[in-house]
């Protein structure tokens, strides 16, 4: 089991394979899967905030964007392009992309994930 400690803005989190997302990656929990490859998995959000709401998550256990390093730039690009390709396959031309980083931003699962939301007019500011 992979685990490490991450200090995220003076709060320490232990990243283990115990998040709901790591259980999805490991096949312990089923999901409405939209895509999977060697780097990531994408699935519909069970608590959808828009008519179309899916997540793209890396298989690499990263707590948040705050933790990402220069070496993760190809992975981050892959996650975004995977989401774009899923959106295009759903014939979407407009969508919102969201990455919450840390508790104050609304991150509730401490495994990096990118939200893709569409199907309605989005308001601004979002929060």
Q: What is each PLM-predicted segment?
A:
Residues 2-127:
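HIT superfamily nucleotide-processing domains
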């Amino acid at each position: 089991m992979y685990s490490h400690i991450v200090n995220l803005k003076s709060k320490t989190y232990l990243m283990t394979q115990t998040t709901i997302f790591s259980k999805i990656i490991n096949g312990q929990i089923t999901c409405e899967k939209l895509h999977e490859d060697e780097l990531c998995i994408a699935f519909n959000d069970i608590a959808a905030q828009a008519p179309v709401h899916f997540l793209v998550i890396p298989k690499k256990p990263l707590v948040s964007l705050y933790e990402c390093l220069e070496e993760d730039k190809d992975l981050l690009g892959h996650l975004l392009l995977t989401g774009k390709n899923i959106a295009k396959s759903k014939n979407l031309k407009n969508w919102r992309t969201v990455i919450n980083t840390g508790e104050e931003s609304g991150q509730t699962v401490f495994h990096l994930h990118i939200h893709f939301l569409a199907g309605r007019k989005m308001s601004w500011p979002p929060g």
